[in-house]
């Protein structure tokens, strides 16, 4: 596995005083599937050589595995660190809903419109992973295939192996519509199904594993994280052993992580005086202005939070290419007026954005720890 600077260039490793932005024209999660399923005559330099011209490809996504976290723990992941490749960028926000949709569709967030974890849709805030609003299940009121209608995997219908409980979720319907879903309940079944399908001559198989992300959210980046990385590395080793000789196994992720622990603050009251509602998530918080308050909101947010967040208006983010060179009208309508994009390890709380436990590890922002993810490959 190459060093970071050798793979993407030292200039890509920005100081976190400046936001790290995706490389939408190069090594990015949005470009992996097109490179594998619709390759050009000239292979992109960011695609590891073992993935070139393989008769069969297995793409494994390890949710939550950032390049910086892996690079600091090479001794725990001998299989991953022996593979060819290095870091690429994911998309913004650095969040599962957005990145997995970019991976499956081969489109930027501005094109596919799943532009955050919690997005503004028709006057409501939709939690994309749960596909719920304040009124509950939103699969009827906000049909997933209408909110995101682009076909996954360039219209191919590959087998996709994911957790069985995700099969009928709104998010699965939005970003994996039309694929051949194979559910698993324990990791060994994920490996077994990948082996079965590749031995049946499937040319492309996609497998999703969420253990690292789950552990990091609950326990942070410490002993539990290290143990889960060891387990994930073993899964990849088992996949390489299970597939036919010559199969290319490609491993990537949707985002990295930072440990926020108790470093969570509410949006300042003087800022909230100009806010009608909030969307996004703790490290990429969208503020939707009260009518006529957009300029006042921008000024107040910069004054109160400018030291510990990148404060940007919707236009500044769109014009800056954060979501890609094109942002559709539908995607634009799902954004707030001002974003608080957290620096360092800070997160912004919001009463309507809660879960079953307090998050220790988080993601969503534009730091290098969250933006850079591995793209690795090896032949069985």
Language-model features, listed with the residues they occupy:
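Feature captures the catalytic ectodomains and active-site-proximal regions of enzymes
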Residues: 1-380
């Amino acid at each position: 596995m190459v060093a970071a600077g050798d793979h993407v260039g030292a200039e890509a490793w920005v100081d976190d005083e400046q936001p790290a932005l995706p490389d939408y024209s190069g090594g990015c999660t949005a470009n992996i599937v097109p490179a594998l399923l619709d390759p050009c005559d000239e292979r992109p330099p960011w695609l590891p050589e073992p993935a070139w011209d393989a008769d069969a490809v297995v793409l494994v996504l390890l949710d939550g595995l950032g390049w910086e976290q892996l690079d600091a723990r090479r001794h725990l992941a001998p299989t991953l660190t022996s593979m060819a490749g290095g870091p690429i960028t994911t998309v913004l926000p650095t969040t599962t809903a957005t990145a997995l949709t970019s991976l499956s569709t081969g489109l930027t967030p501005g094109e596919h419109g799943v532009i955050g974890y919690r997005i503004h849709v028709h006057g409501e805030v939709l939690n994309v992973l749960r596909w719920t609003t304040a009124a509950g299940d939103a699969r009827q009121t906000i049909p997933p295939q209408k909110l995101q209608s682009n076909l996954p995997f360039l219209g191919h219908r590959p087998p996709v192996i994911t957790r069985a409980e995700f099969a009928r979720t709104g998010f699965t319907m939005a970003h994996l519509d039309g694929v051949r879903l194979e559910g698993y309940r324990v990791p060994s079944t994920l490996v077994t199904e990948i082996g079965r399908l590749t031995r049946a001559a499937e040319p492309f198989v996609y497998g999703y594993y969420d253990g690292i992300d789950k552990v990091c959210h609950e326990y942070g980046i410490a002993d539990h994280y290290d143990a889960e990385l060891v387990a994930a590395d073993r899964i990849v080793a088992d996949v390489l052993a299970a597939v036919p000789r010559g199969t290319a196994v490609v491993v990537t992720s949707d985002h990295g992580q930072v440990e926020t622990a108790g470093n969570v603050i509410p949006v300042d009251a003087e800022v909230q005086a100009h806010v009608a509602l909030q969307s996004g998530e703790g490290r990429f918080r969208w503020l939707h202005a009260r009518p006529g308050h957009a300029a006042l909101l921008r000024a107040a947010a910069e004054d109160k939070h400018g030291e510990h967040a990148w404060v940007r208006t919707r236009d500044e983010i769109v014009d800056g290419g954060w979501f890609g060179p094109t942002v559709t009208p539908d995607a634009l309508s799902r954004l707030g007026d001002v974003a608080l994009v957290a620096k360092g390890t800070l997160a912004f709380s919001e009463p309507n954005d809660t879960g079953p436990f307090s998050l220790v590890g988080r993601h969503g922002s534009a730091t290098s720890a969250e933006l850079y993810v591995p793209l690795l490959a090896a032949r069985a």
